[in-house]
Structure formats: structure tokens, C-alpha cells
Amino acid sequence: MAYDYALVHLKYTIPLAALLTVIAYPIFHRIHFLQIGSLIVVSFLATLPWDSYLIRSNIWTYPPDAIIGPRLYGIPIEELFFFVIQTYITSLFYILLSKPLFHPLYLSTQRNPPQRIARGKVIGQGILVALTLYGVHQIRTGGPGTYLGLILAWAFPFALLTFTVAGRFILTLPLTSTVVPIIIPTVYLWLVDELALGRGTWAIESGTKLGWCLFGVLDIEEATFFLATNILIVFGMAVFDQYLAIIFAFPHLFPKVPRSPTPLMLVQSRFSNTKQYDLERIAGLSDAVTRLKAKSRSFYLANSLFTGRLRIDLILLYSFCRLADDLVDDSTSRTEVKSWTTKLYKFLDLHYKSDVKANKARINDYIDEAFPPEAKSALKYLPATILPSQPLYQLIEGFELDSQFSFHDSSESAKYPIVDEDKLNYYGQCVAGTVGELCVALIIEHCEPEMPDERKKMLMSVSRTMGVALQYVNIARDIVVDAEMGRVYLPTTWLKEEGLTPEDVVAHPRGKHVENLRRRLLSEAFKLYDEARPKMNGIPKEARGPMIGAVETYMEIGRVLRELEGGVELERGKATVPGGRRLKTVLKALFSA
């Protein structure tokens, strides 16, 4: 039947490609289109003459009744499509499995690699050279090893090239993003090829093959072909990721980066000397990621959905916020609180009340002088030049307000500063609304810097409102944990309506009256959420899905609290969202954004 080869695509390759496209759609960025499109062009042009030679030499044949008819340089159109669809499928597997990774961290081995990485690269290069030479030998010898030789001599020089330029990076990556995206599509295509060979859709002529089968009727040469080509695709994707990581991680090398880096920038990153890499910045990014993973599972999951320099700056912003919070929160006296907040205010003054470029050395000297070593990277790499100042000052003010629970005078309003709903809202504005505003400021800067002022103001306001909503959920979740620390964020006026005092909540943080107040706080949170959520659709598309995903994962905590009052799964008194439900929430948000 003339449609046999076409049916292979209709039954096996196109459905898989479609499924992977649907799965990957929410995280797809224009950078991914650039990567996949470039690899498809390269693979098509590299495979075309080689495949044409195989057919013209009668090594590979297609029964006339198995193909539709149109050919290019003797290659059936179905085979040409295979070049494209295989590259697309394997690239999608790579993207999906690599998305959680933060690639800039893997640049740390480029200048002075560990011995195992340096040795691994040399061994890998040696293996690829040996396979290439063996392939050449088989071609020269002719006979049964010809086809295998043609595969090895064609594929592995390309693999050697990519491994030479990115071997250290590839070896540093986890196996889940290198070996796994090679193995899964390879095994799948082995099974497809086994079916096609069994049906006679294509054939390898006897006399040019060894006659060994991996299983069934799958010739060892065909198995080697799919393995080798998928290695090429994954190596090619890794090369792209290395160059993109260089572009995004080092502002001193690439001060301005468009939404999609240009081909010229990729070339420039290729020829950047590793001595120019700012490894201190990479170490700072590593510290920031460690803070993020340890302190906020929801934000860590959401952050992996962002791309490029925006993702980096969001991580650095979070690291600063967490560091400032910890410095104040870990203080042992009111004097120490005042000392840290004064230093943080002065740090911000140096950025916003003086010429930053002229005072860069002064800022770094002040960081070294005033802060402990573990705090330096979070302060040094805060992207202050593209952040508004007012939310940062207000954030520190919020941390000061928090400290009143531990260090206060004898009055009740000083010991429990959340005296009424206005004070609660103000506190939420300080510690969470500001963070929402800062995140949106980064999104606008990286995704749509030309955004009209009116829309900017609207998004800033919406982000503040949503930040307060999330903080209310946080307070509702942590009533027990906060009470253990002597803190009560429920407004004192609300407590009086239930016949309680803050001391009652500290002593007995569970019970009917406290649950009534939890419900009330969640109700206020969802009112703010309902007000702000529709307006979040005005966020630039590249960041809309991840931003909404971050919001929804946190609001899901509130939904769990509402659904399972008195019976929620607790972790030190905190309601948790099961991992599967959290993932489902993120995916729903991404698809609907």
C-alpha cells in the first residue's frame, strides 16, 4: 500500500509529537522555538546528503508500494518528514525534563572543572574519535559493516564537535536531562522501527549490514542510528542551553538582552573566554537558589516556569527579601533589630539616593563592612537598578513591625501590633504587597518595558492587592505555628468579637472561636483574590502563566483550609497541599493563562 510509511507517522510519530506539544505548551517560550527550529534546520541539512547517498547506493530501499511518491534527492517525502519529527520529539523530551534546572549554576565548572568532569570530557572525546575512526574503517573495508560504518562516520564527528564545545556543561547536568531524553525517544523509535521493518515499509539491503538484531527484526544498524541521532539532538540542545546560560547569567558581558537572544549573541557567548565569567555571581545565584528551595516550595516550583534573566532576577529578589527577613527575625534584642534595619535602610539609600555607578565600590565596601559573609551575595546581586525603591523601604518597615512581637514595651498594642483590620492590611501591604509589586516591576522590565504608564500602575496596584491576599492565606495557615512563637496576626478587634484576647490564642490556638476567625480571614483573602485575579490577565504573556501559577499554588492552601476545617493534613501546624494537587493547580493555571 502506497501509504504504509505515511501511516507510520500517522499512527506513531505525529500522535506522540502532538501529545508532547500539549504537555509542553504551558512552558513553551519563544527561546524554545528558536532552539528547536535551529536544530531542525541543522539536522535536516546534515542528514539530507547522507540519506541521499544511502538510497542512491542501494543500502537503504523503499518498496514502491510503501511510499506516496514525491522525493527530494531520491529521499521519499515521508523520510524527510522523519528528520523533522524525530528532532522535534526528542527536543521536547529534553525541554520537559530540563525545565526544572537552573542552567547558570552549571557554568561553575567551566573555568576550573573538577577532575572527574575534565577527565570525563577527555574520555568522551576519545570514545567519539574511536567510533568515528571505526566507522571510517568499516566504510573502507566494505561488505557487511558498510552501513554501520556510514552511521558512525557521519554522526559522531558532529557529536564530537558539540561535546568539545559543551562537554563540561553536559557532564555537569543531571542524567535526567541528558541520558533520559536520549533513552526514552530512542526506545520508542526502536519499537516503531521494529514494526516498520516487520511490515516491509523500508529495508536494509543484505551485504551492507552485519545481520545482527537488537531484538525481533530490528537491525543493530537501525538501533545505532536512532541512538546516535538522539545523542546529537540532546547534545545540540545542551549547547544552546550553555550559550543561553552565559548570556543570561552575566550582565557584564551582555548588558541588554532582548526577549529572544540574537544569533550574534549566541556566537559571542560561544567565544566568551571563561576567564571573563563572574564566578562570584554564580556562587551568589547558588546561594539564592538554596534559600529559595529551603524557604518556599511554592515559589520554587513557580520560579522554574520563568525563563531567562527574568528568572534570575526573581531568584535574586527573593533571596534579598528572605535575607532581610532573617536578619531582623533572628535578632535577639530590640537594639539588634534597630541595628539591622538601619543598615538595610542605608544599603537602600546608597542605591537610590546616590549615583549607583559612581558608588558601586562604596556599596560593596559597605556590604563587606556591615553584613555577615552569608548575607553578602544576596545584597550584592539585588537587581536594584530595575526595581522601584518605595516597596523595598516598605518591606523593611514590615519586618520591623514583625519584630514588635518579640521586642516591645508593656502595652498590649505594642506586644500585639495587629490591633485592627487596617493594621492587618497595612502589615500585608508591607511584607507581601511590596513583593508582588517588585515581581511585577521585574516582569515589566524584562517582558514589556514600553508598557503604557496607566497599565503599569494598574498592574502594580493589582500585584499589591494579590500580595495581601496571599499573606492573609499565610496567616490563616500558620495560626498555630505563630502562636508557638508568641505571635498573633489576627486583629485584636476581631478577637474581642469572639470573646478572646491575643493571650488566649497564644495559649490555645485551636478551637471553635479561632476557626471562626480563620474562616473570616480566608473570606477576606478570597475577596481580594477575586478582585485582583481577572486583572492579572494584563501581565505580559511570557510571564502571565508562571505568575498566575505562583498565585494559584498559594491560594490552593486557602482552599485546602476551607475544605478540610479541623481535619487538614498538618506539618508542624501548617496545612499542606499534596504534591499532585499542587502540580495540577499549576498546570490548570498555565493552560488558562
UniProtKB/Swiss-Prot annotation:
Keywords: Carotenoid biosynthesis, Isomerase, Membrane, Multifunctional enzyme, Transferase, Transmembrane, Transmembrane helix. Its main location: membrane. GO terms for molecular function: geranylgeranyl diphosphate synthase activity; intramolecular lyase activity; lycopene beta cyclase activity; squalene synthase [NAD(P)H] activity. Pathway: Carotenoid biosynthesis; beta-carotene biosynthesis; Carotenoid biosynthesis; phytoene biosynthesis; all-trans-phytoene from geranylgeranyl diphosphate: step 1/1. It catalyses: all-trans-lycopene = gamma-carotene; gamma-carotene = all-trans-beta-carotene; 2 (2E,6E,10E)-geranylgeranyl diphosphate = 15-cis-phytoene + 2 diphosphate. GO terms for cellular component: membrane. In the N-terminal section; belongs to the lycopene beta-cyclase family. In the C-terminal section; belongs to the phytoene/squalene synthase family. This is Bifunctional lycopene cyclase/phytoene synthase.
